[in-house]
């Protein structure tokens, strides 16, 4: 492998441009948009993407046994889809999205849930890459199957019962990363059928407040999310839902 400097959670567009031809580097387009955004992630990928990028279908690579959307896929499904995308053991994976820094973080988390640590997010995503005039293409990559081994990290997931218990007893900090208006229930949820408001006791840290104007992560963003200092857990939560018929991994 020719990666000389070790990428961590975030890599810059300059880093990716310098390492894009490394044989063990794989790039993923993880674009996904809320219904009210009026964008089609797959169509945009087919029209233009970073050379060699594979498209990660967030709507399809999920737990199809659940009645809730975007639940984390079972390990065997994740492995099957990654092998079909030519991604496997020994690959350094860099993930980006078309909004700058939005859905790529979810796919990064999915890799980490499966025990894969050689994975990073492109800081600023596709908008920054294009703004800098870097190379793009509209051709699909050549895919070759590669073996992948995973080990699901169950400690990274809390189900609805655990979160409700923590909220009731105040045993953990529960962070809601949606915008303030959605947190306060002042606007309807973009997904139909969801109640407005937030989990009792949760705190609102809108993800957009952690970003710079160009969509890159603000100073100290990673440290803010990984360091609690008081021994408490910090959980990232999504929308409050109607009572589910099944508990499992946390939805987006």
Positions of PLM-derived features:
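Cytosolic catalytic domains that perform sulfur/thiol-centered chemistry
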Residues: 1-252
